[in-house]
From Swiss-Prot:
Catalyzes the synthesis of cyclic GMP (cGMP) in rods and cones of photoreceptors. Plays an essential role in phototransduction, by mediating cGMP replenishment. May also participate in the trafficking of membrane-asociated proteins to the photoreceptor outer segment membrane. It comes from Homo sapiens. It catalyses: GTP = 3',5'-cyclic GMP + diphosphate. It is a single-pass type I membrane protein. Glycans are attached at N297. This is Retinal guanylyl cyclase 1.
Length: 1103
């Protein structure tokens, strides 16, 4: 592209470029002469007739940041271009097209994306990464391309650059000035884009004179990283406002969620600080309940968000970004399937930037008489343009103000509290008061000098106060010069015997725990000789850590541990001892036990007299005892993460002591205590210094106490009493062996302590513990061996040891709580699987129960009984009932064993149940050999009930013809069947074992039809015959004649003998002799052996 084309904003312009753009090179001019008339005609055409295309590039992190991508920049840019192309006022101008350009989230890639984007477009909206803003401005000015960098916090309107709205830095500064909050801190998300935004914003605020205390990044990107960032803010210089440079939680920003939850945990949302989101300045949030959907599920986040003031662009009261999106969708300018609730309000910002850039191009060309103009001219018209934005007017002197939103701690909606116009400097109330945490007021303002460009602010102090302070300091210095000696001694004495920092404790300060759990100002009962006989090295042993130990007391509400000095008579505490103890008390580290004071018992009465004349060091007490106690508790599972966490705590504690010039000298697992959070702390440090200052001789060491002692110290008792740094490293190695092997020092050597100490003191051979390579990482074992090297100079320093041990875990943090949480998570997962398995089994059993219940009762009735709903009786106008009975069942029962009768009925009714499954019938009940079925209830089926019962009866009769009893196959099984149709009432009777029963004369009549029937016959009443004939399905009935029915009199009844299309064989009814019963079996059909059994059961009946 030529230079003239670049000046034209990336488009070729015949007027600017001249013939060189239109014609071939000069040597080819003769070949072009025949076409000269056509060329002259083209040159005479007006520029608007060229139908040129102006391409607007939209550059942003659309591909690498999901929240930015939710703004749907493609739809926003195309919507703006489409509206401009349809604008009648721009007819004859260029056609606007858009190109969506991805900007990498990493800063180096962002710079490259800007360079490539400027080579492809005529105007550019972007970039978003502030690190690329200034390079983009310079490159755009060189290329002559108009630039609208909407995402840059601090952009100057010059050259080809034209900010779409007020830069974020100006808006934030105007807000801070309105409230007088000068001391601010910035917390950014760890991504490059936000880190660069924080740097650019802090630079802009500092350039305006504000004291930005810190710019902190959240790393790692979780709740712990948020806590660490806020701790830095809290522990740094005092601030009033915290600017959160990250995605807003209202748009789903997890970083801001973590930050606000951490602020709530740390108590920073109590009203002393105000939190200001940075990204909301770039788009328009509207008051209303939709904006707080992200807070609905977290009461902690709602409380924390009460400390947030949200500055955002203002839409007119009659609309919002969401309303504008709905109107565009209704006009079919946006896809109908687009979920508008999921579209970020950044949509409107992108639309406005594209629209403003394109209108600036159009107005610049119109002002130039239709000719193409430079990017600088386009930028000037953009700055002065007055155009309709997506939800309000843009540009010119009527720049839309900002609105300050707040919540009321309930989280149900956002309220507009103030309207802010940075250009005019106006800050007007919107009618709703701001709500601060706990109903308090806003943080107080900082000195006004911070916002006065003509005044130098000296840390926020007025010059008069500074002068008075100087005079006060000078006066105090002069007074101190005369009274230094006296005040020093008085203050030292008062500090040691009284006040919150006293170190001399008496029996009035310590409450000793009673051996049996009660509290008193006494020690445990026992002889003074037994207390004095305890070795100092045994003080931290396992039994002494229990609550019944006389060495445990309560001081200022906390349990403390008392370790006595050797000897029984200590008249006073020597000044050197006080000085040495004061230095030890100043040691503060999470892995070093805190020294609280020196206890001297004088004038004690009663059982407290046991401590009379005893001097003891009072230190904090840890509930889990010593490391030796913890390793002895086999019920506590110690994985490598657990062990490495304990060892890392130990290394950090020793490292701290060495940095402070303190050699422990007595380091062993009994002197390492573990608190309730499984944090290891070192105690008994500096004990040799205290003994030396108090001029007390230590007790002779026992061999059991010297297992951790370095060989050079064993050879020099004086050196052993003082201790050395290299000797602590050796002791560390022995403790590492204890933890790794979970055994006593040198336990695998099977030697007595005396033998071990002698061999360590006097090699060769070299005596060291034996540790298997599979008990810990190889690096740990190698470090252990380096630490117990024979030559002290070969042992690593504690700094080097710390670095080596950290590398064992590849830099991962080793925390016991994390290890325990992982174990709990495994247990929770196993429990969830077990619950899921049991739930599935329960659901399966429930299905079985439901299936069994629906087999016993109709489904509707069963469901009502399960829910406890009363089952009302139901009247059925027309049903057909079926009754059947086994002929001669009493005789068969007499000839059979009870189990054979049960098998007979089970086989027969299983056969019947299989048959009725293919018919629309309901099995009511079976009583003995009686079988009752109904159709037309509980589900009505019109007139089909008679046909269903008739078909079922024919199928049952056909199946009975081939049925044989297992125990008497030669005896035929005959049944009588009776059918009757009529009305009845159905309902559930009883609460215990409820039954679905039928009531009415129809039931009695059907039973009479069965009892008056004949074997292998289907006895049918006239009412049923009438329905069958009305159905006209070819049922074949024969008139039986007049039949006497009990309680009914004589009626005409019929036999059902078949149906058209029914081809199954039906058994032939037996011929009944005159006078014979239809309820029995003839003797000729009974086998002889069964007949004899029957005669025994009924003597004289068959003679």
């Amino acid at each position: 592209m030529t230079a003239c084309a670049r000046r034209a904003g990336g488009l070729p312009d015949p007027g600017l470029c001249g013939p060189a753009w239109w014609a071939p090179s000069l040597p080819r001019l003769p070949r072009a002469l025949p076409r000269l008339p056509l060329l002259l005609l083209l040159l005479l055409l007006q520029p608007p007739a060229l139908s040129a295309v102006f391409t607007v590039g939209v550059l942003g992190p659309w591909a690498c940041d999901p929240i930015f991508s939710r703004a749907r920049p493609d739809l926003a840019a195309r919507l703006a271009a489409a509206r401009l192309n349809r604008d009648p006022g721009l007819a004859g101008g260029p056609r606007f097209e858009v190109a969506l350009l991805p900007e990498p989230c990493r800063t180096p890639g962002s710079l490259g994306a800007v360079s490539s984007a400027l080579a492809r477009v005529s105007g550019l909206v972007g970039p978003v990464n502030p690190a690329a803003c200034r390079p983009a401005e310079l490159l755009a000015e060189e290329a002559g391309i108009a630039l609208v960098p909407w995402g840059c916090p601090w952009t100057q309107a010059e050259g080809t650059t034209a900010p779409a709205v007020t830069p974020a830095a100006d808006a934030l500064y105007a807000l801070l000035r309105a409230f007088g909050w000068a001391r601010v801190a910035l917390v950014t998300a760890p991504q490059d884009l936000w880190v660069e935004a924080g740097r650019s914003l802090s630079t802009a605020l500092r350039a305006r004179g504000l004291p930005v205390a810190s710019v902190t990044s959240m790393e790692p990107l979780d709740l712990s990283g948020a806590r660490e960032a806020l701790r830095k803010v809290r522990d740094g210089p005092r601030v009033t406002a915290v600017i959160m440079v990250m995605h807003s939680v209202l748009l789903g920003g997890e970083e801001q969620r973590y930050l606000l939850e951490a602020a709530e945990e740390l108590g920073l949302t109590d009203g002393s600080l105000v939190f200001l989101p940075f990204d909301t300045i770039h788009y328009a949030l509207s008051p209303g309940p939709e904006a707080l959907a992200a807070l609905a599920n977290s009461s902690q986040l709602r409380r924390a968000h009460d400390a947030v003031l949200t500055l955002t662009r203002h839409c007119p009261s009659e609309g919002s970004v969401l309303d504008s999106l709905r109107r565009a969708q209704e006009r079919r300018e946006l896809p109908s399937d687009l979920n508008l609730q999921q579209v970020s309000p950044l949509f409107g910002t992108i639309y406005d930037a594209v629209f403003l850039l394109a209108r600036g191009v159009a107005e610049a060309r119109a002002a130039a008489g239709g000719r193409w103009v430079s990017g600088a001219a386009v930028a000037r018209h953009i700055r002065d343009a007055q155009v309709p934005g997506f939800c309000g007017d843009l540009g010119g002197d009527e720049e839309p103000p900002f609105v300050l939103l707040d919540t009321d701690a309930a989280g149900d909606r956002l309220f507009a509290t103030y309207m802010l116009d940075p250009a005019r400097g106006s800050f007007l109330s919107a009618g709703t008061r701001m709500h601060f945490p706990r109903g308090g007021s806003a943080p107080g303002p900082d000195p006004s000098c911070w916002f006065d460009p003509n005044n130098i602010c000296g840390g926020g102090l007025e010059p008069g106060l500074v002068f008075l302070g100087f005079l006060l300091v000078v006066g105090m210095g002069l007074a101190g010069a005369f009274l230094a000696h006296y005040v020093r001694h008085r203050l030292l004495h008062m500090q040691m015997v009284s006040g919150p920092n006293k170190i001399i404790l008496t029996v009035d300060d310590i409450t000793f725990l009673h051996p049996h759990g009660g509290t008193s100002r006494k020690v445990a009962q026992g002889s003074r000789s037994s207390l004095g006989a305890r070795s100092m090295s045994d003080i931290r042993s396992g039994p002494s850590q229990h609550l019944d130990s006389p060495n445990i007391g309560v001081y200022e509400g906390d349990r403390v541990w008392l370790k006595k000095f050797p000897g029984d008579q200590h008249i006073a505490i020597r000044p050197a001892t006080k000085t040495a103890f004061s230095k030890l008390q100043e040691l503060r580290h999470e892995n070093v036990a805190l020294y609280l004071g020196l206890f001297l018992a004088r004038g004690a009465e009663g059982p407290a007299a046991l401590w009379e004349g005893n001097l003891a060091v009072v230190s904090e007490h840890c509930t889990r005892g010593s490391l030796q106690d913890l390793l002895a508790q086999r019920e506590i599972k110690l994985d490598w993460m657990f062990k490495s966490s304990l060892l890392l705590d130990l290394i950090k504690g020793i490292r701290y002591l060495h940095h402070r010039g303190v050699a422990h000298g007595r380091l062993k697992s009994r002197n390492c205590i573990v608190d309730g959070r499984f944090v290891l702390k070192i105690t008994d440090h500096g004990h040799g210094r205290l003994l030396e200052a108090q001029k007390v001789l230590p007790e002779p060491p026992r061999a059991e106490d010297q297992l951790w002692t370095a060989p050079e110290l064993l050879r020099d008792p004086a050196l052993e009493r003082r201790g050395t740094l290299a000797g602590d490293v050796f002791s560390l190695a022995i403790i590492m062996q204890e933890v790794v092997c979970r055994s006593a020092p040198y336990a695998m050597l099977e030697l007595t302590p005396e033998e071990v100490v002698q061999r360590v003191r006097s090699p060769p051979p070299l005596c060291r513990p034996l540790v298997s390579m599979d008990q810990a990482p190889v690096e740990c074992i190698l470090l252990m061996k380096q630490c117990w090297a024979e030559q002290p100079e070969l042992r690593p320093s504690m700094d080097h040891t710390f670095d080596l041990f950290k590398n064992i875990n590849k830099g991962r943090k080793t925390n016991i709580i994390d290890s325990m949480l992982r174990m709990l998570e495994q247990y929770s997962s196993n429990l969830e699987d077990l619950i899921r398995e049991r739930t599935e089994e329960l659901e399966l059993e429930k299905q079985k129960t439901d299936r069994l219940l629906t087999q016993m009762l109709p489904p509707s009735v069963a469901e009502a009984l399960k829910t406890g709903t009363p089952v009302e009786p139901e009247y059925f106008e027309q049903v057909t009932l079926y009754f059947s009975d086994i002929v001669g069942f009493t005789t068969i029962s007499a000839m059979s064993e009870p189990i054979e009768v049960v098998d007979l009925l089970n086989d027969l009714y299983t056969l019947f149940d299989a048959i009725i499954g293919s018919h629309d019938v309901y099995k009511v009940e079976t009583i003995g050999d009686a079988y009752m079925v109904a159709s037309g209830l509980p589900q009505r089926n019109g007139q089909r009930h008679a046909a269903e019962i008739a078909n079922m009866s024919l199928d049952i009769l056909s199946a009975v013809g081939t049925f044989r009893m297992r125990h008497m196959p030669e005896v035929p099984v005959r049944i009588r069947i009776g059918l009757h149709s009529g009305p009845c009432v159905a309902g559930v009777v009883g609460l215990t074992m409820p039954r679905y029963c039928l009531f009415g004369d129809t039931v009695n009549t059907a039973s009479r039809m069965e009892s008056t029937g004949l074997p292998y016959r289907i006895h049918v009443n006239l009412s049923t015959v009438g329905i069958l004939r009305a159905l006209d399905s070819g049922y074949q009935v024969e008139l039986r004649g007049r039949t006497e029915l009990k309680g009914k009199g004589a009626e005409d009844t019929f036999w059902l003998v078949g149906r058209r299309g029914f081809n199954k064989p039906i058994p032939k009814p037996p011929d009944l002799q005159p006078g014979s019963s239809n309820h029995g079996i003839s003797l000729q059909e009974i086998p002889p052996e069964r007949r004899r059994k029957l005669e025994k059961a009924r003597p004289g009946q068959f003679s």
